[in-house]
Regions:
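Mature N-terminal, pre-catalytic/accessory segment of carbohydrate-active enzymes
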Residues: 1-48
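Alpha-helical scaffolding within the catalytic cores
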Residues: 5-12, 34-39, 88-92, 145-148, ...
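Conserved, mostly hydrophobic/aromatic
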Residues: 25, 97, 141, 160, ...
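Substrate-binding cleft and catalytic face of glycoside hydrolase catalytic domains
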Residues: 46-239
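Noncatalytic carbohydrate-binding groove/subsite architecture in carbohydrate-active enzymes
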Residues: 177-305, 315
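Aromatic/acidic polysaccharide-binding cleft in carbohydrate-active enzymes
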Residues: 270-375, 382-384
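Carbohydrate-binding surface patches
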Residues: 368-410, 416, 421, 446-452
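C-terminal beta-strand-rich structural cap/linker in extracellular carbohydrate-active enzymes
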Residues: 431-457
């Protein structure tokens, strides 16, 4: 490959299908303040396949939804009596989400509790007194949404996740890893016994590898029950670190004999500095973390998203959900002036790709000591349309980037759009000369392009 060519696309080499299930989010149109801010159409435009329900009470203030303690507030009561559940707010939230085009990925348990680092000051992350009783409560929730129980629904909710980040500390689980492993197995066995067709797993670890992870998987192996999926998280500014997480999880699962257990990375986000997103951070650290091109939800973050999503298409990863928690704020898609941020447009870019195209084609990226180019080529199901998505992460200095293309001789370019520090999916010029495609950069920072073609009639 010529030294000035960043990657080569071969549209004659179909390498399989795109996986749209990797394009999910932890957010949805909000239920609180819905009369003031209806965001259904904006979320539809992102084409997320899944919406994971973790932390939803935190950005729907005043609403008792999703978390077990909101749906079943008095844990000593009978979990087989429908009168002891409060489903109404969750019913509405799930309806809104599904009508916005997303499937539900339901996290059972509690949202994170940031009020203290002391176990005796927590309320919702305490270890349940009776694991079997708690499992019956969770069975009631699943039954309501999948079997129509308690004036419920027959939704096709496939994924049910047990807990979230238990090894993080008391803000998520106040017990030991041994207690959690026993709790996880108890709930897993109870739910699979009544609902064999759903997928039950978890527990949304902060990383795929570690002592807690081994303890939970060993407990499952000892109990002779495999989780249907294994979920974990990652926050970083290194695309390659996040792209290889599924491989690490896959190898761990296989080592325990869980070769059929799926892998899910269902919280992930660009992270410059954890301290800079807290209210106690010095102002200069907040500015470094949040503002400018390298900011938390700005162009570096947006192109990072695309680099990861492109890279994952060749990894052993069944599902993923971006953290995206609520539409506004530090982890959202809008800034304090309600302008859609760069991450919103990056998710829209990838959503358009996986919703309109089916097949992925061969791409050979030029080796580089520090990889900054991530690229994917795609074809529609009928092969009448083609697309190229390019992410230039952390910005090559070149004013232009060139790519070799093969197999598009009978296609014409119908649209090209750029996402960079100043433009949000704006139309742009591309130069196609023979079998070479060249795109221009407006500045040396991160940028991404979505270029679409249609077959000449």
């Amino acid at each position: 490959m010529a030294s000035n060519i960043k990657a080569a696309f071969d549209f004659t080499n179909i390498r399989g299908k795109l996986n749209p299930a990797q394009h999910g989010s932890n957010s949805a149109p909000p239920y609180s303040r819905r009369w003031l801010f209806n965001m259904d159409e904006e979320f539809k435009s992102l084409h997320f396949m899944y919406a994971r329900t973790h932390d939803w009470p935190l950005w729907n203030p005043g609403q008792r939804l999703i978390d077990t303690h909101f749906i079943f507030p008095l844990l000593h009561l009978d979990p087989k009596d429908p009168k002891n559940y409060y489903f109404r707010a969750t019913d509405e939230m799930l309806r809104i989400t599904q009508e916005a085009g997303m499937k539900i990925f339901y996290r059972l348990g509690t949202s994170i509790e940031h009020n203290s680092d002391q176990a005796n000051e927590h309320n919702n992350t305490l270890v349940p007194e009776d694991f079997d009783h708690y499992a019956e409560v969770l069975a009631g929730i699943v039954r309501h949404y999948t079997q129509g129980w308690a004036n419920g629904f027959n939704y096709d909710i496939e994924y049910w996740e047990i807990w979230n980040e238990p090894e993080l500390g008391t803000q998520t689980w106040c017990g030991t890893k041994e207690e959690f492993a026993r709790f996880f197995v108890t709930v897993l066995k109870r739910l699979k016994s009544e609902f064999p067709k759903i997928k039950v797993g978890g527990p949304a670890f902060t990383t795929p590898l570690g002592e807690w992870q081994n303890a939970v998987l060993q407990a499952c192996k000892d109990a002779n029950i495999a989780p249907d999926f294994y979920s974990c998280h990652c926050y970083t500014n290194e695309p390659e670190k996040l792209i290889r997480r599924p491989r690490e999880a896959r190898e761990l699962l296989d080592s325990f004999g869980f070769t059929e257990t799926e892998v899910s990375i269902n919280e992930w986000h660009f992270r410059q500095d954890w301290s800079g997103v807290t209210s106690r951070a010095p102002r200069d650290l907040v500015r470094y973390t949040m503002d400018g091109p390298l900011g938390h939800c700005n162009i570096q973050s947006a192109v990072f998203n695309l680099a990861v999503l492109i890279g994952w298409q060749d990894e052993p990863l069944e599902t993923a959900c971006y953290y995206g928690a609520g539409p506004d704020g530090v982890w959202g898609y809008r800034d304090h002036e309600h302008r859609w941020n760069k991450c919103f447009y990056s998710m829209r870019m990838f959503g358009e790709l996986v919703s309109e195209y089916v097949y992925k084609v061969g791409v050979d990226v030029t080796p580089h000591p520090y990889r900054n180019i991530y690229a994917i080529g795609a074809l529609s199901e009928d092969k009448e349309k083609a697309a190229i998505l390019i992410a230039d992460y952390a910005g090559s200095e070149a004013a232009t980037c060139s790519f070799a293309i093969k197999g598009l001789e009978n296609y014409r370019c119908v649209e090209a759009r750029i996402l960079d520090n100043t433009l949000d999916l704006a139309p742009c010029q591309v130069n196609i000369h023979g079998n070479t495609l060249t795109v221009a950069k407006n500045d040396p920072g991160s940028a991404a392009w979505l270029i679409e073609f249609e077959k000449i009639k």
